[in-house]
């Protein structure tokens, strides 16, 4: 049977279309609809809070590992329940579409849609981990991302155009009904050949995924790689639109580059990346595509140097997003291989959250760096930010290894730790993470001041982080605290995985 002849594989790929629909609606279409309806821009800005469930889905994923619903098996029951909720919310949105002045109702529906969508994403990702065979991972990774992006393009792009010709009530009704065939796919999708044992307690479902993953050999290098592999791309893509506008391209040029050429290149690259990973091997694919996505940023440096030149800009955009797609296709295979089936929901949510973390943090960092260095030098710098990720790749997948093995038990670091000693080390990890993050942001702010003609001074940004006054400063401080807590928890989980926990306090 060929790689597309498996109903398992086709089910996973088709369900990814259901994942992409609500994302395009909440992220793109609803804000555009509100702006066209004349809603205050400050109110529209609050709609970004509706995106929060996708960022925090790790919080309720352990419950989905622990408590399967009574219908359709361990993960398909959660998928179907989420799709039923999305249909109901879509119909509700269609019902209030002729009353955009009911903005808070629309906001509440958008938030509920995001929560149902994030829950669906957790379940679909976990189902893919459990049901797919290893030889299907490459085709699945490429196909899933291609269908996901296509659905986002429909709900976040085509829907806006169609609403201009008809109405938002009609568009939202169509989007709600689009989940019905996806529900049929969910109902007919097969169960895994070997159903993994569910965690026996909620505590096991929360703690087990972290300790189980960190007990693997080279797990820390793998986690660092997950965070760093797409760092150069994240920094570049955070400011692509403002960069093109400042260079002098008009709105039509920017739209063609980002919406048409960019989407087509990204979808084609991801689809091809997944398929090539199957033939090249995961190790070689990560190496080749990693270098391509790093050096593709030099195309933007050329645009910054040359100025307004449409062919050069279009080529740079296609090369950068196409190579990004190749890397994403291989990376999707890596996530499927790394996730343990017993904790499929939580571990995949954890790894995918770590993967998206640099994208969330890249905007502020990229803005400060571009302001401090200028556009050309900023894009050259992004090439060097890709090197740490490749160094981590060399730690667990040397070039000579085509298919890496991840289920090797790591050596012990010593005798079991007492709880008090574990707490002290976790607090140390949190403080070190906080200091490192604060120092990096302060250096970037100081460099921005140098570019503006001021002396290099780390104290003002440090004082702003320690005693914030503005909304921006409070946001930065909150981000640093979240980063510190993550560092502390990661330190504790790693030590428990490698040394164990003594029953003595």
Predicted regions, residues:
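Helix-loop boundary and gating motifs at the non-cytosolic
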Residues: 2-51, 220-225, 229-243, 247-248, ...
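Glycine-rich segments within core transmembrane alpha-helices of 12-TM secondary carriers
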Residues: 54-57, 138-163, 352-363
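Helix-to-loop junctions at the C-terminal end of transmembrane segments
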Residues: 56-73, 268-285, 370-371
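C-terminal transmembrane helical hairpin of 12-TM major facilitator-type secondary transporters
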Residues: 284-331
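C-terminal ends and interior cores of transmembrane alpha-helices
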Residues: 79-100, 291-308
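Juxtamembrane intracellular "pre-TM" segments in multi-pass secondary transporters
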Residues: 1-5, 191-222, 411-419
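Symmetry-related core transmembrane helices of the 12-TM Major Facilitator Superfamily/SLC fold
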Residues: 81-87, 170-187, 377-395, 477-488
């Amino acid at each position: 049977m060929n790689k597309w002849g498996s109903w398992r594989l086709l089910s996973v790929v088709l369900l990814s279309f259901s994942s992409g629909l609500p994302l395009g609606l909440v992220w793109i279409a609803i804000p555009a609809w509100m702006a066209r309806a004349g809603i205050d821009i400050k109110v529209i800005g609050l709609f970004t809070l509706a995106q929060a469930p996708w960022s925090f889905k790790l919080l309720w994923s352990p419950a989905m590992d622990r408590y399967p619903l009574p219908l359709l098996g361990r993960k398909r029951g959660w998928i179907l329940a989420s799709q039923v909720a999305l249909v109901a919310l879509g119909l509700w949105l269609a019902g209030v579409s002729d009353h955009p002045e009911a903005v808070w109702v629309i906001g509440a529906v958008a938030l509920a849609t995001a929560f149902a969508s994030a829950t669906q994403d957790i379940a679909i990702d976990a189902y893919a981990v459990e049901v797919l065979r290893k030889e299907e991972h490459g085709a699945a990774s490429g196909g899933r991302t291609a269908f996901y992006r296509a659905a986002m393009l429909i709900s976040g792009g085509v829907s806006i155009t169609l609403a201009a010709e008809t109405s938002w009530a009609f568009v939202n009704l169509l989007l709600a009904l689009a989940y019905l065939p996806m529900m049929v796919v969910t109902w007919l999708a097969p169960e895994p050949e070997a159903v993994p044992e569910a965690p026996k307690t909620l505590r096991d479902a929360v703690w087990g995924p972290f300790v189980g993953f960190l007990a693997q050999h080279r797990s820390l290098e793998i986690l660092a790689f997950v965070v760093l592999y797409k760092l150069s791309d994240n920094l570049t893509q955070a400011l692509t639109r403002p960069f093109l506008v400042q260079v002098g391209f008009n709105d039509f040029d920017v739209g063609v580059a980002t919406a048409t050429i960019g989407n087509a290149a990204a979808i084609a690259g991801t689809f091809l990346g997944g398929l090539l990973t199957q033939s090249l091997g995961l190790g070689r694919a990560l190496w080749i595509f990693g270098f391509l996505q790093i050096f593709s940023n030099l195309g933007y440096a050329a645009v910054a140097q040359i100025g307004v030149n449409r062919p050069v800009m279009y080529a740079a955009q296609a090369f950068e997003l196409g190579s990004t797609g190749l890397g994403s296709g291989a990376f999707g295979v890596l996530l499927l291989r790394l996730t343990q089936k017993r904790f499929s929901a939580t571990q995949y949510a954890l790894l995918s959250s770590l993967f998206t973390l640099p994208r969330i943090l890249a905007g502020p960092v990229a803005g400060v760096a571009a302001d401090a260095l200028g556009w050309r030098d900023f894009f050259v710098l992004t090439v060097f930010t890709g090197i740490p990720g490749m160094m981590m790749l060399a730690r667990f997948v040397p070039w000579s290894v085509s298919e890496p093995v991840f289920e090797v038990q790591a050596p012990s670091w010593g005798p079991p730790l007492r709880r008090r000693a574990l707490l002290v080390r976790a607090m140390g990890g949190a403080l070190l993470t906080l200091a490192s993050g604060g120092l990096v942001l302060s250096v970037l702010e100081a460099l921005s001041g140098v570019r503006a003609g001021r002396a290099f001074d780390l104290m003002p940004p440090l004082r702003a982080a320690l005693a914030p006054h503005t909304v921006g400063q409070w946001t930065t401080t909150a981000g640093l605290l979240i980063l510190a807590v993550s560092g502390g928890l990661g330190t504790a989980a790693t030590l428990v995985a490698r040394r164990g926990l003594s029953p003595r306090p």
